[in-house]
């Protein structure tokens, strides 16, 4: 018995040392959230009273291309297009400043970080949650909710990723124009649109994502017509191109134009790169960021949005959704998405990769109405098991279509060819060809293009909740659309 006690003591000491070492290692990979504790609240305003803007003069806040896109499709402007009331914004700022001055023991900071025209909402950020609560008493605020709070700590930023100087010898597929991208475009019969000159020229695509690592340095993107970038998560960030490479891979599926290496589905389109996904946290405010990005895309005159993002639950369960919410009308992000076709924009959104988990279904905003939700298949045209399935709660077919995403050929943030899996990557493959089809059929409306793609997919006559309407045939869509135009 005398030897057992020292042995137990020794084992306990080893366990404590191991636990301490593990904790130290974990802590070393994290850092305190910059600036301390902050909160973001969303305020819904009751109306757009005393607006200096008029639907008769939309050029004051919408680009000519945006106005022309609507005119071409016969779409009228409405009250949702008007900016939020400047009077209410000034009153919010005045009241917040007054409350802040009354705080004696601490420095109170606050700022309006964004608005939504379509939902008539305002986002305010402050380190004083009581200030945000007090503002809810203002008579023009119809609804208020917290949509973000800073975490106690975040992962340390990743080291700078070096870009490769050139392609590896094995990246080239000699004699194959599309290189590694051949299967993903030929599966959709999109190469035939390219063969007659429709490669996305004249079309503008907004890519909504979480990061576009090294898109400013990777040689293949030097040929890409990038109109601009905008960060809705950290508007003043100087590291736009140093975040995750998820958006880099997404962009490459459309914009790459390196024959025998990788040619994407719309190499001649123009692009806006819009960051609206916060990689450090997962909270409802990202729906607001996504909405702000979509509204920006609208005002900039974008034709198509490619979004490989989806949500269903959040950190600290702040605003988690239930399956019954998959109706296209409940989640803010889904309500935004459902409005896009009515503004003349086609949204192509990923179905989500939760098919093998407890959720199993598509995520938000994949449940939206009048969009193309994209699932994933493998090279044998078999469903990828990770793909979220339908239907929506109100019985609509989802996903709408499927494309190669298990795996897809892409360009990483290092500038190398990789193969990655997910509906994140089948989505831009489809989005690029939507641009080519719309280029070929410029007189079609957003809704007509969406319907044409569904109707010419492989199982339009017998859709299901796994493949939706099936694998699109963009050449067939073009031929039928062309006949209908004549």
What kind of region is each of these model predictions?
Residues 251, 274-278, 303, 361, ...:
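Hydrolase catalytic cores
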Residues 327-344:
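Catalytic-core regions built around general acid/base machinery
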Residues 19-21:
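N-terminal signal peptide c-region/cleavage motif recognized by signal peptidases
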């Amino acid at each position: 018995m005398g030897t057992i006690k020292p042995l137990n003591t020794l084992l306990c000491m080893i366990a404590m040392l191991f636990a301490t070492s593990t904790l130290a290692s974990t802590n070393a990979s994290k850092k305190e959230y910059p600036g301390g504790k902050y909160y973001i609240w969303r305020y819904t305003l009751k109306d757009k009273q005393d607006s200096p803007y008029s639907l008769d003069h939309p050029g004051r806040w919408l680009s000519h291309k945006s106005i022309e896109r609507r005119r071409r499709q016969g779409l009228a402007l409405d009250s949702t297009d008007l900016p939020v009331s400047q009077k209410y914004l000034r009153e919010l700022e005045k009241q917040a400043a007054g409350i802040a001055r009354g705080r004696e023991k601490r420095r109170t900071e606050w700022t309006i970080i964004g608005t939504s025209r379509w939902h008539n909402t305002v986002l305010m950020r402050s380190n004083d949650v009581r200030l945000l609560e007090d503002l809810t008493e203002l008579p023009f605020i119809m609804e208020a909710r917290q949509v973000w709070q800073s975490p106690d700590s975040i992962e340390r930023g990743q080291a700078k990723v070096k870009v490769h100087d050139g392609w590896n010898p094995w990246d080239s597929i000699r004699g194959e124009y599309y290189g590694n991208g051949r299967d993903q475009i030929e599966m959709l019969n999109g190469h035939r649109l390219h063969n007659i000159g429709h490669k996305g020229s004249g079309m503008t695509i907004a890519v909504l994502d979480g990061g576009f690592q090294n898109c400013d340095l990777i040689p293949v993107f030097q040929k890409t017509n990038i109109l601009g970038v905008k960060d809705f998560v950290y508007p003043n960030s100087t590291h736009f191109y140093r975040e995750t490479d998820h958006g880099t891979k997404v962009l490459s599926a459309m914009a790459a134009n390196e024959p025998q290496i990788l040619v994407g589905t719309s190499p001649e389109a123009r692009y806006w790169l819009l960051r609206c996904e916060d990689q450090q946290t997962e909270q409802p405010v990202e729906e607001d960021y996504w909405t702000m990005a979509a509204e920006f895309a609208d005002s900039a005159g974008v034709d198509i949005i490619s979004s490989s993002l989806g949500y269903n639950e959040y950190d600290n369960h702040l605003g988690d959704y239930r399956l019954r919410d998959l109706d296209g009308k409940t989640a803010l992000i889904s309500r935004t998405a459902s409005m896009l076709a009515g503004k003349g924009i086609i949204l192509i959104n990923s179905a989500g990769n939760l098919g093998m988990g407890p959720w199993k279904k598509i995520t938000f905003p994949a449940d939206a109405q009048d969009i193309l939700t994209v699932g994933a298949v493998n090279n044998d045209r078999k469903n990828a098991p990770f793909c979220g399935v339908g239907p929506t709660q109100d019985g609509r077919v989802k996903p709408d279509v499927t494309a190669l995403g298990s795996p897809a050929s892409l360009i990483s943030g290092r500038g190398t060819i990789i193969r990655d899996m997910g509906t994140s990557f089948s989505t831009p493959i489809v989005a690029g060809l939507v641009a080519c089809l719309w280029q070929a059929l410029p007189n079609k409306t957003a809704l007509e293009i969406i319907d044409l793609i569904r109707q010419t997919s492989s199982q339009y006559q017998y859709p299901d909740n796994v493949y939706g309407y099936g694998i699109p045939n963009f050449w067939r869509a073009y031929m039928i659309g062309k006949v209908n135009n004549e």
